[in-house]
Every structure is written in structure tokens, then in C-alpha cells.
From Swiss-Prot:
Protein name, as recorded: Small ribosomal subunit protein uS7
NCBIfam families membership: rpsG_bact
Gene3D superfamilies: Ribosomal protein S7 domain (1.10.455.10)
UniProt-recorded Gene Ontology molecular function terms: rRNA binding; structural constituent of ribosome; tRNA binding
Organism: Streptococcus uberis (strain ATCC BAA-854 / 0140J)
GO cellular component: small ribosomal subunit
Keyword Repeat attached: no
CDD domains: uS7_Bacteria
Assembly behavior: Part of the 30S ribosomal subunit. Contacts proteins S9 and S11.
Function: One of the primary rRNA binding proteins, it binds directly to 16S rRNA where it nucleates assembly of the head domain of the 30S subunit. Is located at the subunit interface close to the decoding center, probably blocks exit of the E-site tRNA.
Family (UniProt): Belongs to the universal ribosomal protein uS7 family.
InterPro entries, A to Z: Ribosomal_uS7, Ribosomal_uS7_bac/org-type, Ribosomal_uS7_CS, Ribosomal_uS7_dom, Ribosomal_uS7_dom_sf
Length: 156
């Protein structure tokens, strides 16, 4: 582990179209090989697809989807007396958002539609309706935390 100080947290700028920091973070998460323009096009096209399909504001649908994806509890491995326990802990707000975006993009990439914008749009709409792979990931995480509730007293 590095002995230097922790790097300062860099603030992301809100995106120009929706004036939202979480949309900027989504664009950064979708981006591959530093191609931000391509990533932004994918995200904005997905949002326009969502607006056409649902008739609602795409940003509201996205925020609903994120609420449905973001985990409240997760398990952390803790070594006590020679054995590892999966200890359920609450997820910090920053990490909730990070995990939610990660799961959303990974689930989108794993889908079968032809283009990434279609996959992302469908996954966001599914998540807003409490279905889809990213919501299932959250449910699995919560189930794991619930199953290991007996070890909650090992929290540190």
C-alpha cells in the first residue's frame, strides 16, 4: 500500500445537457479508451430513446432507476480468530452511487441488443421498473447481507 497521502477527491463537473453530476459520472463509466465524445453520444442517445419510449423526462427515469439499483447494505470480509466472516455493513452514499453506476453499465454491456445505446436505454428502463440484471445484482447483495446478519456484531 502507498505510504503517501490519499489523493484528493476530484469533483466532477455537471454535464452540459442535463446539468447533472450523476450523468457526467455515467458518461465517465461508459467511456472506453478515453473516448468521452463517443460515450456522451451513447448516453444522450440512450436518454432520447428513453424519452421516446416512456414519454417521461429521461433524467427522472434514470434517477428512479438509480434509486432501484443502489445498494443499502453489502458484505465485507472480516478475519476473526482464524476464520473469515462476511460481515454486513451499510454502504456509504458515494459508494452507493459508484456501485449503482458500475452495475448498470456492466449489465448493459452484457445485454443482447445491437448497439450500446439500445442496451443502456433498455437497462435503465428495466431498472426503473424494478427488473433487469442490475436490480437483480442489488437484490443478491442485500440477500447476502441478510443471510450473514448473525455476524453483524463483528462490524468495525
Amino acid at each position: 500500500m502507498s505510504r503517501k497521502n490519499q489523493a484528493p477527491k476530484r469533483e466532477v463537473l455537471p454535464d452540459p445537457l442535463y446539468n447533472s453530476k450523476i450523468v457526467t459520472r455515467l458518461i465517465n463509466r461508459v467511456m472506453l479508451d478515453g473516448k468521452r465524445g463517443t460515450a456522451a453520444t451513447i448516453v444522450y442517445d440512450a436518454f432520447s430513446t428513453i424519452k421516446e419510449a416512456t414519454g417521461n423526462d429521461a433524467l427522472e427515469v434514470f434517477e428512479t432507476a438509480m434509486e432501484n439499483i443502489m445498494p443499502v447494505l453489502e458484505v465485507r470480509a472480516r478475519r476473526v480468530g482464524g476464520s473469515n466472516y462476511q460481515v454486513p455493513v451499510e454502504v456509504r452514499p458515494e459508494r452507493r452511487t459508484t456501485l449503482g453506476l458500475r452495475w448498470l453499465v456492466n449489465a448493459s454491456r452484457a445485454r443482447g441488443e445491437h448497439t450500446m445505446k439500445e442496451r443502456l436505454a433498455k437497462e435503465i428502463m428495466d431498472a426503473a421498473n424494478n427488473t433487469g440484471a442490475s436490480v437483480k445484482k442489488r437484490e443478491d447483495t442485500h440477500k447476502m447481507a441478510e443471510a450473514n446478519r448473525a455476524f453483524a456484531h463483528f462490524r468495525w
